[in-house]
């Protein structure tokens, strides 16, 4: 058995541009202009990006009832802003139509490349989180960090923004293909981090790129994507490794904004993916501590945004590592019955930037669901302890009823736990298992 990081044991004892019908091959881009109808479906073709249609897998009467064409490319106006350690504050704008914009920039194929993609009604109002994430990444390593700004296409109505995500994904794929053609970029060195609709954009980009390295879906948007075919939503085939963080997984009918569906190679559900600790407090305090705009963001979607917080703090966290564990369900996890990484380490993984260490254990045909607990304030990480209590059964013994307490001492401190909040029956010869967590680092 491997000892998992961060947990301790205590024992008391791409879309096609060609339509094939019969034996006839029709090039949609040549034969159909924008917004024309083809067999009852509307189609829009965009130079270099291909054709986008309504209907088919993109329509569902319940899950995707309004299906429209994307806006024009000029309206969505995708911008690629490059940051490096050489220029951490001043962006270089990269353009897929301008080779010199790349050649004259600090972009290097000798560095891994990180894309950051925002979601709905984001960036122009709520951009600071992306630049903060960029700063953390550059502190961590020597990366090319590209912030993708598609704020021209992410406004109301929501269904129009969802349609525009397909174009944004195609734009990212086009830039990567240009970088591959112009300077020899290896797509396997590219990692797209997308939040909300940005997660779905990452999937659209990945399906067009041969061997995209990694996608991190940060609470991928539920409305218009949950329960839809893989052509419509993110799925494990979109990159060589897809990891997902779920923090707002209630149904949209209960005001949840993120997917509950498992859509990656590994899907993390911190705090069961719902009701994140600290959010009720954050919704009010954020107006004071973070300003009006970020306060609005937290008030409307604290659970949804919490996935960004978790990823952000995972980048340079060393003292405490957020580890998720495979478990039957959340209740079983809370009972302390899932603390085994397995002999090969395949039953646990680090949530966040270092999740790629799970890649050797991935199964392209199966999503692995993992649970962990977090605190309600930064850096959010908790140390998890599995406590196993086994009672002997001497010849003269009787069962007892009461509370069980634990005092845990380490080189750097001591923490007291109440293992049984309610009166509990204790039977001689029985074994009891608990999960306790703390944000205190008590071991050297």
Label for each model-derived stretch:
Residues 237-240, 261-263:
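Short, solvent-exposed loop/turn segments at the edges of secondary structure
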Residues 118, 192-204:
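Glycine-rich nucleophile elbow surrounding the catalytic serine of serine-hydrolase chemistry
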Residues 171-176, 242:
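Short, well-ordered amphipathic alpha-helical segments that serve as non-catalytic structural scaffolds
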Residues 214-225, 244-250, 273:
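Active-site nucleophile loop of the alpha/beta-hydrolase fold
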Residues 184-196, 215:
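Alpha/beta-hydrolase fold nucleophile elbow
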Residues 2-147, 154-164, 174-187, 233-236, ...:
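Flexible, membrane-associating and regulatory peripheral segments of lipid-active enzymes
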Residues 205-209, 230-237:
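Mature extracellular/periplasmic domains of secretome proteins
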Residues 240-244, 267:
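Catalytic His-Asp charge-relay segment
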């Amino acid at each position: 058995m491997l000892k998992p990081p961060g947990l301790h044991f205590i024992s008391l004892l791409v879309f096609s541009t060609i339509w094939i019908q019969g034996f006839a091959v029709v090039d949609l881009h040549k034969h159909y202009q924008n917004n024309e109808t083809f067999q009852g479906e509307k189609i829009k073709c965009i130079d270099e990006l291909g054709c986008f249609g309504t209907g088919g897998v993109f329509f569902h009467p319940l899950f995707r009832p309004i299906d429209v064409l994307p806006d024009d490319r000029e309206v969505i106006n995708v911008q690629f802003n490059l940051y490096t350690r050489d220029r951490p504050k001043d962006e270089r704008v990269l353009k897929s139509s301008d080779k010199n914009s790349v050649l004259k920039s600090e972009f290097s194929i000798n560095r891994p490349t990180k894309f950051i993609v925002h979601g709905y009604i984001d960036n122009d109002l709520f951009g600071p989180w992306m630049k903060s994430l960029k700063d953390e990444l550059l502190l961590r390593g020597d990366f090319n960090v590209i912030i993708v700004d598609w704020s021209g296409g992410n406004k109301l109505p929501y269904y129009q923004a969802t349609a525009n995500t397909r174009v944004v994904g195609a734009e990212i794929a086009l830039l990567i293909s240009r970088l591959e053609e112009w300077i020899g970029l290896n797509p396997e060195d590219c990692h797209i981090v997308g939040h909300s609709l940005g997660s779905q954009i990452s999937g659209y980009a990945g399906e067009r790129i041969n061997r995209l390295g990694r996608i991190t879906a940060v609470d991928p948007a539920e409305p218009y994507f949950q329960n839809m075919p893989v052509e419509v939503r993110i799925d494990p085939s979109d990159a060589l490794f897809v990891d997902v963080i779920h923090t707002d997984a209630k149904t949209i009918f209960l005001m949840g904004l993120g997917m509950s569906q498992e859509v990656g190679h590994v899907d993390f559900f911190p705090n069961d993916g719902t009701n994140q600790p600290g959010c009720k407090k954050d919704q009010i305090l954020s107006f004071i501590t973070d300003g009006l705009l970020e306060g609005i963001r937290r008030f409307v979607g604290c659970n949804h945004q919490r996935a960004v917080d978790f990823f952000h703090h995972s980048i340079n966290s060393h003292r405490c590592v957020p580890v998720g564990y495979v478990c039957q369900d959340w209740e079983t996890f809370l009972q302390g019955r899932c603390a085994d990484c397995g002999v090969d380490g395949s039953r646990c993984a680090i949530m966040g930037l270092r999740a790629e260490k799970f890649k050797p254990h991935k199964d392209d045909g199966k999503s692995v669901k993992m649970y962990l607990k977090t605190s309600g304030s930064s850096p959010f990480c908790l140390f998890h302890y599995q406590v196993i209590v086994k009672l002997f059964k001497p010849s003269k013994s009787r069962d007892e009823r009461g509370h069980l307490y634990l005092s845990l001492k380490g080189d750097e401190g001591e923490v007291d736990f109440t293992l049984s909040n309610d009166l509990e029956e204790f039977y001689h010869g029985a074994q009891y298992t608990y999960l306790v967590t703390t944000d205190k680092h008590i071991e050297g």
